[in-house]
Structure formats: structure tokens, C-alpha cells
Amino acid sequence: MIARRSLLLAGAAGLAAPALVRPASAQEITLRLHHFLPAVSAVHRHFLMPWAQKVATESQGRLRIQIFPSMQLGGAPPQLFDQARDGVADIIWTLPGNTPGRFPRIEVFELPFVADRRAAPNAKAVWEFYQTHLRDEFREVHPITVWAHDAGVIHANKEIRRMEDLRGLKLRFPTRQAGEALRALGAAPIGMPVPQVPEALSQRVIDGAVVPWEVVPSIRLQELVRHHTEIPGSPTFYTTTFILAMNPARYAGLPAELKQVLDANSGMAAAEMAAKVWDEQGPVVREQVARRRDNRIIQITEAEKERWMIACRPVLDAWINGSAARGFDGAALLADARGLIAKHAAARG
């Protein structure tokens, strides 16, 4: 039995909707959206639910989205992309990095010290990059949008101020490139989906995890570790990319007017809406953690950050050098990604 589900109906006040005349006999369609975080998570409450409500409102209630958090439709987080491809779910939200090496081009944003510290420039850059470079990479699904989060933070059971403090530390990483960056800094990276982090910490399988502030409360990380290390400024240590994707046959089967509604809530508009969650909720969570008596927020110095950047340079070189065998020019993609991030960061001021 499915324990919890969110059925999101039309009628959310204050949402602008395009003119859509509803015939008396108009078909109503419900799409199932599947993801891996609990319903209390910020992305569920502040992005997926409002987004689904907006779609319902603008379709005059004809297109409803039923959200299933915490893998309630079965499977494991790395299977979400294939669930959209195969029609197990109509829509999924996941990390391309959950299946290491399968989507190599989008990894360019996940390389160390490439991303901006804010989510909005990263999200806009990833979506624009998709238009030119990623359509073939995600051809098995209908991408609604792609984006990336803000600065990642190292949360651990010991104080981390210098590279030497990371030596041998077992840290959960979200993507292949984040893992390589941690290894370059001397840590012992361990890959796992974020819902597994609390149990792994409790059983001392890991000493900490790298995640953005936004996700911390949903996995009770502030209760399980006491030390939170930030990397100052931009570029930041790492980010993670995300995709909101739909089964292509399900999309193709929608009536034209409902496709129009979904398309209006896709692409850059959806990427910006998602990024706002990280940029707004991250500082709120950080402040909550700062007020906890036993928790300590640490920011490494600029000089120490420079050491980390130098140590991580081989990670970028290895990705570039391996790109030719995968059929693309890694150096060119890296230059393009950096240029797009810089453009959108400058536009925000």
C-alpha cells in the first residue's frame, strides 16, 4: 500500500494561467510524478508541489500531477530515469549522476570549482547548455527541464579547515565527479543516494556527507553531525545536476492544448523556479543550523580554497582527456559551461 501521496488539484490561488477554454466533456488526465526524497523535503514542498499546482491551474484542472515521494512506486533512486523511459512513472525527478558515466556531457557542471555558489546562474546555464549539447544525451525521455543547485557543503563528524583534515575521511558523494574531487583532496569517497545517509551515519559507515544546505533537514543531517564546512565564493567546490523528465509516449499522447500548458511550465521557467528553492531555502536552513548549540559552521580561507583548486585540477584534466573516447570535446564543453555560468552570474549581479 502506498503510505503517502500528494494529489495536487487545480485551484491554487494567485497563479497566472493562459486562456484555456474547457469543453464540458474535456478529458482529465492524471500524471504520476516519482522521486526519491521525502514529502517534507524542500524540493517537494517548494518546487514540485507548486509546479504541479501551476500546471493544474493553467489547464483548468484537466492536467493533474500526483506526486509519489520517497520511491513510493518502487525501485531505487538510480532506477528513476529508466522508470520515466519505460513508463513505470509518467514523470520523474532525479540526478543524472545517480547512474555514473551514463550522461557524461552534463558532468561538466559537476566538475570541481566550475559552478557558481548560487543556484540560479547554474540552473540557467545548464538549461541553455542542454539546448546545444544535451538533447541526444537525454533522447530516451522528454526532458521538462534540467538544472543544478547552489554551493555544496561538507557536513562531517569532525572539524574540517584544511585539506589535511579530509585525509581518510569517509564522505558520501552524490556524483562521480564529486567523488573524484573528494579523492583528490585525500578523502575516502563513498557513493550512495542521499536517503541512505542517515542510516550510514548512524552505523558509522560514513563520517559525513556533501550536500547543499537545502536538503539537510529532510535527512536530519544537523542532528547526526556537528561540523559544516563551506567553501567561500565562486567558483564553488561542486554542484549536482538534476532532471525533471517525462515518458516520451505519455507526452506525445497529450492533447495539444495540454502540451501547451506543460511546455509553458518547462525549460528555463521551470529551471528558474527550481533554483529559487535552493537560493531561498539554503540560507534559511543555514541560519537554523547556526543557532543549534552543538553545531559549528566553518568557512575555509581563500588561501586554503586555492590549495583545494590546485589539488582538484587533475580531476578536470582526466575528464577532458577521456572525452574524446566518448565522442565529444571536453575542453570545448568546459569552456562553454563556464561561459554560460559567468553570463548568468553577471546578469544577476
Region roles according to the model:
Residues 2, 6-18, 25-120, 136-349:
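N-terminal secretory/targeting leader peptides
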Residues 118-131:
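A gly/proline- and charged-residue-enriched helix-loop-helix capping module
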